[in-house]
């Protein structure tokens, strides 16, 4: 599979669809952090692609092993097998999977998604753009893309970015997901840096920084593995300031339902669900209104 590299300069164009490209993903180096300690790339099992594993190992600058038995107990590894790329550690396994979201992006369900409602732009139609500044495994970005946004996904951790890139590439072959995935572009690097480099203002910036609070049982495995790579946001104010400085019409901040405001900044209004809350900051020129859950 061809991999398309895009310069970190001129990122304003990066929300455009990837029409006619062989891969669904464009990547850019924008100061991504190095891989976590004790990470190895492992190729194993029928259907595994040794060439893909070797390229991933080289890209991340980590050892390439043949079989999980070669990985030290307690160490994390990126497993490349016939199912794609997974992060494994101590019997836990994390793999991006957009297929399980197929029902949520159906037209009859998409409009009920709280994120889609929060990101809605009054009077907006086609050509809307968004930056998911804390992409993670890309589920929120997929919802926005399915809703018609061209989405730039920022992910600073190269291991999580590798999982996300694999998810996007696999989803590009899905009849259900391909149309949305064509509107998603991945940029590896610090989101504050990427937001500062944008040539054009997006309509929406989405923020969902790692939250250091308690873990729900359903999310525990995912959080445990991700938190071995990414720490909670260490400068919330800087992140919000960069998002606002990018000049969007709206900044949407995903928070735990009962969590505090990000950086202590009161939103213009919020949309609340049982588990999460979306706090919305509206640019003054587009009119603000106050509302709460």
Segments predicted by a language model, with ranges:
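S-adenosyl-L-methionine
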Residues: 2-5, 14-18, 26-128, 156-201, 293
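SAM/dcSAM-binding transferase cores
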Residues: 3-4, 15, 35-39, 221, ...
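Conserved proline-anchored active-site loop of SAM-dependent methyltransferases
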Residues: 130-143, 202-220
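Conserved SAM-binding motif I beta-strand of class I
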Residues: 150-155
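A short, acidic, amphipathic alpha-helical segment used as a generic capping/interface helix at domain edges
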Residues: 190-194, 231-244
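Mobile active-site "lid"/loop adjacent to the S-adenosyl-L-methionine
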Residues: 209-239
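Conserved Class I SAM-dependent methyltransferase catalytic core
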Residues: 236-282
């Amino acid at each position: 599979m061809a991999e398309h590299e895009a310069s970190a300069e001129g990122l304003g164009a990066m929300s455009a669809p990837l029409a006619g490209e062989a891969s669904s993903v464009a990547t850019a180096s924008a100061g991504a952090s190095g891989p976590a300690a004790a990470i190895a790339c492992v190729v194993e099992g029928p259907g595994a692609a040794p060439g893909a594993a070797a390229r991933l190992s080289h890209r991340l600058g980590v050892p390439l092993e043949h079989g999980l038995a070669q990985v030290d107990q307690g160490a994390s590894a990126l497993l490349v097998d016939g199912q794609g790329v997974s992060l494994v550690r101590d019997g836990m396994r994390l793999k991006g999977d957009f297929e399980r979201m197929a029902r949520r992006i159906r037209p009859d369900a998409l409009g009920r998604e709280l994120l889609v409602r929060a990101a809605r732009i009054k009077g907006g139609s086609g050509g809307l753009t968004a930056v998911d500044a804390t992409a993670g495994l890309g589920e929120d970005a997929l919802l926005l893309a399915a809703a018609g946004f061209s989405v730039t996904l920022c992910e600073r951790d190269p291991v999580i970015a590798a999982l996300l890139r694999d998810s996007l590439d696999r989803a590009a072959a899905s009849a259900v997901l391909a149309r949305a995935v064509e509107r998603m572009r991945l940029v590896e690097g610090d989101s504050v840096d990427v937001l500062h480099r944008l040539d054009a203002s997006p309509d929406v910036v989405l923020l969902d920084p790692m939250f250091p609070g308690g873990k729900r049982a359903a999310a525990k495995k995912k959080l445990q593995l991700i938190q071995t790579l990414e720490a909670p946001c260490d400068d919330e104010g800087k992140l919000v300031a960069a998002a606002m400085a990018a000049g969007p019409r709206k900044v949407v901040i995903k928070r735990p339902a009962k969590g505090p405001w990000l950086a202590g900044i009161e939103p213009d209004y919020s949309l609340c669900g049982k588990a999460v809350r979306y706090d919305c900051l509206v640019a003054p020129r587009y009119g603000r209104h106050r509302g709460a859950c």
